[in-house]
């Protein structure tokens, strides 16, 4: 009987102590930060040799060599863009950004992105996968890093995108600032 009371007492004390200690959540701190730039050159019917992206679907009556009017609603673009560590398109490539974006809002410039960085350099080997909404007119936008392979196996985090350069509908450069919060 005495041992049962002792076990019950220990159990009650442990329960009381566990509920008395506030459950503090660890603040999220990035385990790795990276910065890349990718350069997109939209095919316009005349630049096949240099183009890195193309319109593959458009609203009825709209050309596949020119974005739809107004907010480009309904255009789907696939891309295979060079990734560099600097702003310059002519700098050494460290990989390719491969995926698509869909202009999905009628009254403002917004797209939905899904793409993968395929990295093959002396510094990084593997892939990083991204997905999310991109309100293009915002100065900075956050999208999810949903996973990776190789050096980035099971990584997750946030990528902050900035439009670093914009030359009409022909060319744009995005700065991608990646913060990984889960690293293996």
Swiss-Prot record:
Glycans are attached at residues 50, 120. Its main location: secreted. GO terms for cellular component: apoplast. It comes from the Eukaryota. Residues 1-20 form the signal peptide. The keyword Secreted applies. Dirigent proteins impart stereoselectivity on the phenoxy radical-coupling reaction, yielding optically active lignans from two molecules of coniferyl alcohol in the biosynthesis of lignans, flavonolignans, and alkaloids and thus plays a central role in plant secondary metabolism. Belongs to the plant dirigent protein family. This is Disease resistance response protein 206. It comes from Pisum sativum.
């Amino acid at each position: 009987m005495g041992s049962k009371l002792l076990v019950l007492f220990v159990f009650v004390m442990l329960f009381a102590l566990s509920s008395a200690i506030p459950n503090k959540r660890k603040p999220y701190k990035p385990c790795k930060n990276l910065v890349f730039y990718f350069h997109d050159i939209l095919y316009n019917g005349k630049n096949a040799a240099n183009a890195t992206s193309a319109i593959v679907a458009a609203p009825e009556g709209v050309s596949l060599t020119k974005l739809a009017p107004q907010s480009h609603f309904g255009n789907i673009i696939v891309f295979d863009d060079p990734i560099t560590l600097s702003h310059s398109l002519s700098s050494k490539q460290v990989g390719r950004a491969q995926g698509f974006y869909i202009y999905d809002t009628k009254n403002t410039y917004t797209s939905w992105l899904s793409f993968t960085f395929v990295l093959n350099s002396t510094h990084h080997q593997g892939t990083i996968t991204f997905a999310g909404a991109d309100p293009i007119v915002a100065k900075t936008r956050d999208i999810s890093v949903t996973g990776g392979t190789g050096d980035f196996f099971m990584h997750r985090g946030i990528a902050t995108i900035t439009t670093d350069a914009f030359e009409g509908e022909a060319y744009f450069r995005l700065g991608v600032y990646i913060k990984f919060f889960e690293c293996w």
